[in-house]
Amino acid sequence: MGRGKKFVPASKFGDLRQAPSRLNGMATKPRPGYAWTMSESLAIHRILVANRGEIAIRVIRACRDLGLESVAIYSEADREALHVRFATYAYPVGEATATDSYLNIDRVLQAAHATKADAIHPGYGFLSENSEFARRCENEGLIFIGPTAECMALVGDKARARQCAIDAGVPVVPGSPDPVENIAEAHHFADKLGYPIMLKAAAGGGGKGMRLVENDAELDRSFETASSEALSAFGNGRIYVEKAIVTPRHVEIQILADLHGNQVHLGERECTLQRRHQKVLEEAPSPVVDPELREKMGEAALMVATQAEYSNAGTVEFLLDSDREFYFIEVNARLQVEHPVTELLTGIDLVAEQISLAQGKKLSFEQKDVEFRGHAIECRIYAEDPDNDFAPSPGVVKTLSIPGGPGIRDDSCLFEGYNVPIHYDPIVGKLIAWGDNRLTAIRRLQRALTEYKIRGVATTIPLFQRVLADSDFINANFDTGYLDRLLNDASEPTDSITDDCDSITEVAR
């Protein structure tokens, strides 16, 4: 990385005005007097985005809106990537493998210092929830756009975060108070809680190190597998045991908190549609959460945030059972993949808020100012082949047609000729639809998926077309096992959702 490594304007990689653009989507509108006046008093002038792909582009766009300069970092595999073209400046950080580039703290910090960045935005994934990275930023005079390193270490440990929720008086799923030491202790808690149980990694998320266990024999097989998977993914193989909630929904609350003790919640997101414990489709508001339950869950989320001394943007996640009782499961100390649905619902630019809060500014609004309008649904577009057990589908994008029209937002890193690499998470974009109600959002999303043409790599677009055609989804009759059951169903998807939408139930309104 020595010779040839230099600080260069991103325009070296092409005229920004001619770079493939995603500006035809539905942009969030800043509140009057906010985004356009912030730059007059900003302590931050240049932000290094410690990420890649669509989330790097999202942060760079926020920088543009705020009149700030941005620095993209890139690996050898991402030299021609779209986020490199979008940024004010670009800086190489290593080889194609993530451990040699985006996960290499020394190289990322070297890039920040070399480019004279004031702050680092971590996006999601990679180093976004790495407390050591946040601490290094703090120690080296860089503003980390996120919670403090101490807070991140607390909520990043699921066992400690669970105890934090208990101390705050928020209900948690019954389980072991600490990670279990061995299989014998796991059996002890399984006997105490009763099957089914969940094995969960004490660190990390995304479904890694998680197993549903139905009996003693399965526990013997699953414990070692879950622990090994967690160790490989997070460098921490500790496992704790929870009682499994039967047919739950996964509902999360978006929070914002400043360093002056002010907090707000921005309502919930429904994240129940998951494949192998990983979210694939999110929506807001949840079709089963009424204003009373929303307020209760929002208050609980802020109680956890207060107990953890949380600041900046974060998400408090809950399981919701069939009796509408909710249980804390974890805190995500970063911007979520699914943040656009909240932005479309509230009109609040979450990335701009993160940048403001990271400078020690007070929240620019109060809870009473938060309004929810309409309904938004997001599909995560992965370069995976649904017909081949969702195997990764790297390759060159030969043809690309991006959907548009009323209520459609596309957050993507694709362009014709882009070579989708094999080295990273296969998410290449997010397609979001907004409507006055859930039915309108569903119809708009179905239209947009039909318009979305990607040739050269396989994507999960056919999966979402199938989901949107399913009457159980349309009528909001699903739980966290819904998608896996749908995928196991040999029936073919229908060509139209018209008939199902005409009979949609009140729960979608």
For each predicted feature, which ranges?
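N-terminal beta-alpha lobe that positions the nucleotide/phosphoryl donor
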Residues: Y34-V316, L320-H339
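Catalytic cores of soluble metabolic enzymes centered on carboxylation/carboxyl-transfer
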Residues: A301, P340-R509
